[in-house]
């Protein structure tokens, strides 16, 4: 009997592992974003929930925030820093919202381009249905020292990062 129970659990686990997940199809055609082959118009908001008198992001109010976003007609959230919490990503997906995930150039090694750790995030979450596309950069004009003051160095970094992302994840656009 124990062997049969163990076999049943193993069979169930294998079945779950091989059940395909439903991921929305995202593509750019000309100047249009298509989601599941239908035009997708971004009605978005930048979201970085830092409570008053705090300096770090806190998702304690995520349920309320998502409800307010939906009531306002928002369908897309742009985040400045990747969310490394599957439960939060699942809540965003369950709310029917999509994410534009931004990667900074130098974020002290936390999912940034300089350290290359942004690729770890993409590997981990590229199949999550909340992801609409990846975004490289935010306000780089404030940090020319990152590129020795030469804009061509920035263009080269963007080109390399885009190529690496497309190798890992051909299913999401890069902005």
Where are these regions (language model features)?
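Positively charged n-region of N-terminal signal peptides that target proteins for export
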Residues: 1-5
């Amino acid at each position: 009997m124990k062997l049969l129970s163990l076999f049943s659990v193993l069979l169930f686990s294998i079945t779950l592992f091989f059940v395909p997940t439903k991921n929305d199809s995202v593509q750019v055609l000309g100047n249009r974003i298509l989601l599941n082959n239908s035009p997708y118009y971004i009605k978005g908001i930048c979201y970085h929930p830092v409570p008053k008198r705090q300096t770090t992001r806190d998702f304690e109010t995520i349920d309320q925030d998502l409800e307010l976003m939906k009531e306002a007609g928002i369908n897309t959230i742009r985040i400045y820093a990747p969310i490394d919490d599957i439960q939060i990503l699942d809540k965003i997906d369950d709310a029917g919202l999509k994410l534009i995930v931004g990667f900074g150039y130098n974020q002290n090694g936390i999912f940034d381009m300089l350290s290359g750790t942004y690729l770890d995030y993409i590997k981990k979450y590229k199949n999550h249905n909340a992801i609409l596309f990846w975004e490289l950069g935010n306000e780089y004009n404030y940090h020319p020292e990152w590129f020795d003051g030469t804009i061509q160095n920035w263009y080269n970094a963007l080109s390399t990062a885009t190529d690496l992302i497309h190798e890992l994840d051909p299913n999401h656009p890069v902005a």
